[in-house]
Amino acid sequence: MSNSNKDHFDMSDLGASLPAAAAALSAEDRAGLVNALKNKLQNLAGQHSDILETLTPQVRKRVDVLRELQSQHDELESHFFEERAALEAKYQKLYEPLYTKRYEIVNGVVEVEGVNEAPMNQEEDKEAGNEKGVPNFWLTAMKTNEILAEEISERDEEALKYLKDIKWCKIDDRKGFKLEFFFDTNPFFTNSVLTKTYHMIDDDDPILEKAIGTKIDWCPGKCLTQKILKKKPKKGSKNAKPIIKTETCESFFNFFKPPQVPEDDDDDDIDEDAAEELQNLMEQDYDIGSTIRDKIIPHAVSWFTGEAAEGDEFEDIEDDDDDDDDDDDEDDEDEEDEDDEEEEKSKKKSSALKVE
């Protein structure tokens, strides 16, 4: 590879070097929110070339060798990503029969051996006669997870009781994934499957490009993402009918209507605060999707029983302990500084007394 090629900045590499929140606004069909960022990166590329130009020939030669080593490393890393993808695909196929069996047990398609032999009193026996599978399995599993619990409103719970299964798969371009939520017939919406698809810029270092959700076909008066407000007319008003207003409300089902980046024509209307808020919303949306994919689907029963939540709590405690240790170190340093100051003051006082 020649030095001129090395110094060239390729904008196609943009996605591989940005954090998820920022890159959420930097794919090719996204709006001009990213143009400023690209300009900054191009300026940085220019600075990179300037730095190389300032090096002495001897140092430049050493840096060139280091860059060759980096190229070798990147090639090995590329092979690693390929092998990892193949390994993940292999085990995903091995998981499928287990997920199918889980679906059958949860939804009462098959019965577990020994269930009818379990001792029960008469009341329990009557209830068990009408009870199939594991009621509210997915609702309970999701509510046990801290991230998802914040998204599920009390109104959502009735609808989520009809959730039969959640699956995920990679999409065709292998730069993203799709979540599928399978619902039993219910009084809230007519869709049997709700999907959420995440398109990524780079599969190896996930960077969100855009997200697309299913349009939910709500039954009349059952939309959970909106609430109807009735306002009484003013006294003496000719129109005696109450004013009816529809307002968007918090709901898990807003997950299927993800935040969208505005079109190019609307670029001038977006200020810095709005752009930052949009970034945060897209990052939060991706966190929810990846939590369902990486935690809920593979470990659903552990979330249902609460065991997985306990494991998460231990991780949080360890993180908090690390933060506390850092704070303690800072406190110790402050105390040492204070001791040094007191000692210095004492020395000055002693010197003053001797002079007198």
UniProtKB/Swiss-Prot annotation:
Annotated Acidic residues bias: 309-343
A GO biological process held by the record: nucleosome assembly
Domain statement: The acidic domain is probably involved in the interaction with histones.
Subunit structure: Can form homomeric and heteromeric protein complexes with NAP1;3. Binds histones H2A and H2B in vivo. Also able to bind histones H1 and H4 in vitro. Interacts with CYCB1;1 and with alpha tubulin.
Any one Pfam family match given in the protein's UniProt record, by short name: NAP
UniProt biased composition (Basic residues): 347-356
Function: May modulate chromatin structure by regulation of nucleosome assembly/disassembly. Could function together with B-type cyclins in the regulation of microtubule dynamics.
Protein name: Nucleosome assembly protein 1;4
GO molecular function, one term: histone binding
Motif (Nuclear localization signal): 230-235
Gene: NAP1;4
UniProt subcellular location: Nucleus; Cytoplasm
Coiled coil: 34-88
Region Disordered: start-end pairs: 304-356
Classification via InterPro entries: NAP-like_sf (IPR037231), NAP_family (IPR002164)
Keyword Iron: no
Family: Belongs to the nucleosome assembly protein (NAP) family.
Statement: the UniProt record of this protein carries the keyword Cytoplasm: yes
Motif Nuclear export signal, residue numbers: 55-70
Gene Ontology CC annotations of this record: chromatin; cytoplasm; nucleus
Keywords from the named record: Chaperone, Coiled coil, Cytoplasm, Nucleus
